[in-house]
Amino acid sequence: MVKLRLKRCGRKQRAVYRIVAIDVRSRREGRDLRNVGFYDPIKNQSYLNVPAILYFLEKGAQPTGTVRDLLKKAEVFK
């Protein structure tokens, strides 16, 4: 099963997250299937590759709670 979840990047005390499609059995820093966006909580910026996200959602990928909230904020879900 594939999930859309956050992968931590950046440096200490300055986290930036990549939004990735990843196998549910992989750990957080494991190998991802595809990078579909990023989220910077300090600057409150995000970039979403909407066609790639919709592709994975159509294939049955489940977003985590935080990713679901980001997608709702960006109005990917109506």
Curated annotation (Swiss-Prot):
A Pfam short name: Ribosomal_S16
- Where does the protein principally reside? plastid
Q: Name one GO molecular function term.
A: structural constituent of ribosome
Gene3D superfamilies cross-referenced by the UniProt entry: 3.30.1320.10
Q: Name one GO biological process term.
A: mitochondrial translation
List the GO cellular component terms.
chloroplast; mitochondrion; small ribosomal subunit
Q: Which SUPFAM superfamilies match?
A: Ribosomal protein S16
Which UniProt keywords are present, listed alphabetically? Chloroplast, Plastid, Ribonucleoprotein, Ribosomal protein
Q: Where in the cell is it found?
A: Plastid, Chloroplast
Family, as annotated: Belongs to the bacterial ribosomal protein bS16 family.
Official protein name in the record: Small ribosomal subunit protein bS16c
Q: Which organism is it from?
A: Daucus carota (Wild carrot)
